[in-house]
Amino acid sequence: MEVDVDNQADNHGIHSALKTCEEIKEAKTLYSWIQKVIRCRNQSQSHYKDLEDIKIFAQTNIVATPRDYNEEDFKVIARKEVFSTGLMIELIDKCLVELLSSSDVSDRQKLQCFGFQLKGNQLAKTHLLTALSTQKQYFFQDEWNQVRAMIGNELFRHLYTKYLIFQRTSEGTLVQFCGNNVFDHLKVNDKFDKKQKGGAADMNEPRCCSTCKYNVKNEKDHFLNNINVPNWNNMKSRTRIFYCTHFNRNNQFFKKHEFVSNKNNISAMDRAQTIFTNIFRFNRIRKKLKDKVIEKIAYMLEKVKDFNFNYYLTKSCPLPENWRERKQKIENLINKTREEKSKYYEELFSYTTDNKCVTQFINEFFYNILPKDFLTGRNRKNFQKKVKKYVELNKHELIHKNLLLEKINTREISWMQVETSAKHFYYFDHENIYVLWKLLRWIFEDLVVSLIRCFFYVTEQQKSYSKTYYYRKNIWDVIMKMSIADLKKETLAEVQEKEVEEWKKSLGFAPGKLRLIPKKTTFRPIMTFNKKIVNSDRKTTKLTTNTKLLNSHLMLKTLKNRMFKDPFGFAVFNYDDVMKKYEEFVCKWKQVGQPKLFFATMDIEKCYDSVNREKLSTFLKTTKLLSSDFWIMTAQILKRKNNIVIDSKNFRKKEMKDYFRQKFQKIALEGGQYPTLFSVLENEQNDLNAKKTLIVEAKQRNYFKKDNLLQPVINICQYNYINFNGKFYKQTKGIPQGLCVSSILSSFYYATLEESSLGFLRDESMNPENPNVNLLMRLTDDYLLITTQENNAVLFIEKLINVSRENGFKFNMKKLQTSFPLSPSKFAKYGMDSVEEQNIVQDYCDWIGISIDMKTLALMPNINLRIEGILCTLNLNMQTKKASMWLKKKLKSFLMNNITHYFRKTITTEDFANKTLNKLFISGGYKYMQCAKEYKDHFKKNLAMSSMIDLEVSKIIYSVTRAFFKYLVCNIKDTIFGEEHYPDFFLSTLKHFIEIFSTKKYIFNRVCMILKAKEAKLKSDQCQSLIQYDA
């Protein structure tokens, strides 16, 4: 007897997630569904011999029913006699006619998922269908004909018109082909059907409901309009503090800031009233509290007039010793070459202001302008700690609402207190917390940010990742003068604003913005193109230069894929590309007997600035890698929300919008092709990046000619204008670094040059006696050559140097690495003066963060294991809700991100895999300890949690260790590790975490005890099992 159980295919990734949604009544594989049909007909599966032939196909198709589906309809039709005559196309036409003639609007909406679009008035007697996509082809597969033969025409028609049908790709994504668009379930219901205390809320009664108190945005708005909108519950990003070059010579807030604007014309109370409205908008608070808040703001407006910014800035953040003399000497050298000024750049970049000094200046400001009773005692100390934390945050970190409010007790704030009964105290206390949150948010997002912008330039540094550095504006002003003098000699020319305005009108772009990233002895100029484009009517549009180039960018992505696939040149674009080529080379090298290898690495100097724009334009127009026309396809992608955890013990279905989030993504398809969405996803080189998602193609594909997409790219490269320090400049050389298309353009340009000069490296020989096997890769500007012939390596260097001289670019010869000595007779040609300048590598070759063993070709990541280097890449952004889940996700990301290739037998060894594990455990361990410290600090005063914190931190280590090992064994092809390695793996993990947590034993003493006890138990169990085995 057949049993209807959910087999392995029924519990596959996103399919399981689909079952958890309220809108989906049932979701099965087609295989399980046919078994259900068989049971309904009281037949044996032996009558359906063809089912086993299509089992794999049937298990990769999912059929789901909406929640309003009537199961009885299925049973009635399933028991009817089976007829499967006629052609599939005729049957599908009948289904379409049935849907068109239906009076139910939802039936006609199903046409969208079938690849059609309804045209004409819905009240008309006839309708027109236009093809959206090729999804209708999906049902013309032989397997579907076999399914139709098994279940009959009538049941197939029912399946086609009433079910949602998905096909699963090899990456676990479900592509929808039938039924109402699954994305319709994400739409927010406009009707407010949630009951409030005292009866249902009245939609026609504005601002009457008690729940609207803290959520209205204007006089006419009310809570009901915003029930599903998370209003103002989070801090804004700190990005405003970065890269502000405006130099305020008055040593106060900028003139337009509300703290100093109109200070002589409008009274402090009136200005305070305006600021209060800006902070609280139209949300209601009790009158006495409102008056107190306005009074506090007015007090701050009065006190800021007397605050001596210059004195406290000099006191807290002094300029370097003898700054005036140093400044004058450096400014006298502005017109020297960049190389001659390198030591002065190094000196200036070292003049960072310590975070403690910045914190002290901000705290001095608030000590002087805040009313003394605003925050007192412990509350004041905790506020100052939050200022310190805010200053120390990395570039992508921010303080969440709960972290901003924690440890500040509103009951200790005298001016917020109110006399009330114990019964009503909760409501007033809740209001006080809300008011304090709004005030603190305003203080940090407006005052703290404005103070930093006025007096400091904030930036990251090269190779320091997201760590932030503060420079006094006086120092940064000198850096800008020196850098712009260098840039004007190299790539920029100053222009008048009138020329820029004409350029904006003619080409419709917005000028970019230039910023500088400090390096050790120089700087890296980065252009950003986030400014909105102003149209001919002088109205600001929603488009930026990058978004305007979106379709062109999609077209160039097909060029990138063709370059890698054909191949053309030697460019690679990501680590997956690198590892594919590397693995192919290692296999060839092993086939020819693992002969001696020769290594060479080179680096293009100023890669983007060295691109010849005229040649690039010619290359783009004449290349055969670009099709003459393109289709732009738009896909709707439904992704799981990563922070949602399903409780298997207390499971209940929720709405789809609670589990999933949607986004739209576009992809370009070459004009000579018109593949289905499924075919696109099965192509390894597709750019949709849709793994384990739900996806639908629900819009008509747009047609474009190559020339129309290419011209905007050529225009912006040849005529690029930027804004820097209040002046406009035109780029005279190279392509913009920071434009969305620049990396592909640069790679294509150098690949075209490589084709004519380095093609000899493709002539390989697999003769074991004289093997000639080569691997050449270039990631942006970094070359790596591994070859079995020393002559190839020498010729490679000489050819590239010749190409660079012919095309006006240079190689940084200081970064030239070889595994063999170069001929002294060619030093002058290579740009070297002596033997000492040769960089001969031994044992390991380092390239783009990968260390390669030069004898075995085994790999391991090149991870900085200094504590400072480890922590500068850490972004905490702690979540106070489900914090243990946040902690677990953090540890998983530290250990399991981008590590797949380092544990495959085909390209590494067990010894190197263990070295990689050691590095991951050290790096991940220190990051995890920092996160655990944040977690512990947040909950240590929570009596219910405090006793469990250390145990939770330890449990997460156990859980993630098991998940990590399972991932290494089950998810990696040709993995180094097997199940037999698990005991040693777990013990090694515990050993590393014990050592790391022991460095902060005064905080994590109990964690160390728990981990040591677990280690001892594992060793005891291991010994016990060995004794039993011997016996």
UniProtKB/Swiss-Prot annotation:
Residues forming the Reverse transcriptase domain are 498-852
Q: How does it assemble?
A: Component of the telomerase holoenzyme complex composed minimally of the catalytic subunit p123 and the telomerase RNA template component.
Source organism of this protein record: Euplotes aediculatus
Instruction: Report any Pfam family annotated for this entry.
Output: RVT_1
EC id: 2.7.7.49
Membrane-traversing stretches: none
Q: Indicate whether Transferase appears among the record's keywords.
A: yes
**Lineage from the top down?**
Eukaryota, Sar, Alveolata, Ciliophora, Intramacronucleata
Look up the record and report any one GO term of the cellular component aspect. Answer: chromosome, telomeric region
Gene3D superfamilies in UniProt: 1.10.132.70, TERT catalytic subunit-like (1.10.10.1970)
Question: Which UniProt key words apply to this protein?
Answer: Chromosome, DNA-binding, Magnesium, Metal-binding, Nucleotidyltransferase, Nucleus, RNA-directed DNA polymerase, Telomere, Transferase
Write down the PROSITE patterns for this protein, in alphabetical order.
Answer: RT_POL
UniProt lists the family membership as follows: Belongs to the reverse transcriptase family. Telomerase subfamily.
User: Is Cell cycle one of the keywords?
Assistant: no
Single GO biological process annotation from the record: telomere maintenance via telomerase
SUPFAM superfamilies, A to Z:
DNA/RNA polymerases
The record's subcellular locations are: Nucleus; Chromosome, Telomere
Q: InterPro entries per the record?
A: DNA/RNA_pol_sf, RT_dom, Telomerase_RBD, Telomerase_RT
What does the record give as the function of this protein?
Telomerase is a ribonucleoprotein enzyme essential for the replication of chromosome termini in most eukaryotes. It elongates telomeres. It is a reverse transcriptase that adds simple sequence repeats to chromosome ends by copying a template sequence within the RNA component of the enzyme.
Which branch of life, at top level? Eukaryota
Q: What is this protein called?
A: Telomerase reverse transcriptase
Q: Kindly state which reaction or reactions the protein catalyses.
A: DNA(n) + a 2'-deoxyribonucleoside 5'-triphosphate = DNA(n+1) + diphosphate
